[in-house]
């Protein structure tokens, strides 16, 4: 585009981004954001693998302007971490996060729920985790891409997610999106912008972007571009909000020919106890949080 772009967030993730040479990234950032500290609000997140964490790397990230760290811990169980082939123990992750906190107050972790052999009850390691000073936690259900055996059923996974949610609530982390919890004020601004329907640019293989009606996906051969209809764009941006505690405001959808169907579908989920309605705004209930994808599929 020939028009200047204003950025308020940067998210450097996917794989283990901190393993790469940061010099090219500095060049890209300096061309996009000459003065990052002048952007309000400004959030620059980098995802870290626990084994990537060193004093030198953290200082380098700090000098780059990073002010938020997300560390992929995945599990508190050493046997599960070994089966995941993560290459570290819970104690290693704990030490890495303590080092991160010396440089970055705004730091959180990712966890995966539903792995075979996972205990339902809280363990002494949860008590240790409570002392980490977490500002944010993303909790995802296992996607069984490896074809693991003895994967727990959906009801068991939902029970474990509920236990995890209550544990995080005791630490002051509130659920603000179906998979994300934060101390108030530490919500991920970058992801919130996406869920609120704002435009964003994705750089790199597999990264998606949205600018107006244009959609992009990074491929090995370059950037694949497509264009959606105004109706699709309006619905997509609105439906993303359903993932959050803010909920789906249907005001802008009333002009669509499909609005009666959308309204009937939403109201049916209210009766089912999966949504709650406040005027023209629909929000997921706790039960609805666990089946959000199914509700969105109904609306598509």
Place the predicted regions along the sequence by residue.
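Short, amphipathic alpha-helical interaction segments positioned at domain boundaries
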Residues: 287-300
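Generic surface-pattern signal
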Residues: 243-247, 271, 297-300
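A short, conserved structural fragment
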Residues: 270-280
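Generic detector of well-ordered alpha-helical segments enriched in charged/polar residues
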Residues: 235, 239, 263-267, 296
């Amino acid at each position: 585009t020939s028009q200047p772009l204003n950025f308020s967030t940067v998210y450097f993730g996917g794989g283990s981004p901190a393993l790469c040479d940061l010099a090219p990234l500095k060049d890209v950032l300096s061309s996009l954001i000459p003065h990052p500290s002048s952007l309000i609000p400004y959030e620059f997140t980098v995802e870290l693998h626990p084994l990537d964490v060193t004093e030198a790397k953290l200082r380098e990230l700090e000098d780059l302007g990073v002010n938020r760290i997300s560390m992929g811990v995945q599990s508190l169980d050493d046997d599960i971490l070994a089966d995941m082939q993560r290459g570290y123990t819970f104690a290693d992750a704990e030490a890495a996060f303590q080092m991160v906190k010396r440089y970055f107050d705004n730091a959180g972790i990712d966890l995966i729920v539903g792995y075979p052999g996972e205990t339902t009850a809280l363990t002494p390691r949860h008590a240790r985790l409570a002392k980490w000073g977490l500002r944010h936690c993303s909790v995802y259900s296992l996607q069984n891409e490896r074809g693991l055996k003895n994967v727990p059923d959906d009801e068991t996974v939902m029970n474990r997610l509920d236990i995890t949610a209550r544990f995080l609530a005791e630490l002051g982390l509130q659920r603000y999106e179906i998979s994300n919890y934060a101390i108030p004020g530490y919500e991920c601004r970058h992801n919130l912008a996406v869920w609120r329907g704002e435009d964003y640019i994705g750089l790199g293989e597999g990264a998606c972007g949205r600018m107006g009606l244009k959609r992009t996906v990074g491929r090995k051969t370059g950037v694949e571009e497509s264009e959606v209809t105004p109706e699709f764009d309006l619905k997509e941006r609105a439906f993303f909000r359903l993932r959050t505690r803010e909920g789906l405001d249907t005001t802008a959808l009333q002009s669509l020919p499909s609005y009666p169907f959308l309204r009937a579908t939403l109201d049916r989920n209210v009766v089912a106890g999966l949504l709650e309605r406040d005027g023209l705004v629909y929000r997921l209930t706790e039960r609805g949080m666990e089946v959000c994808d199914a509700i969105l599929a109904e609306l598509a």
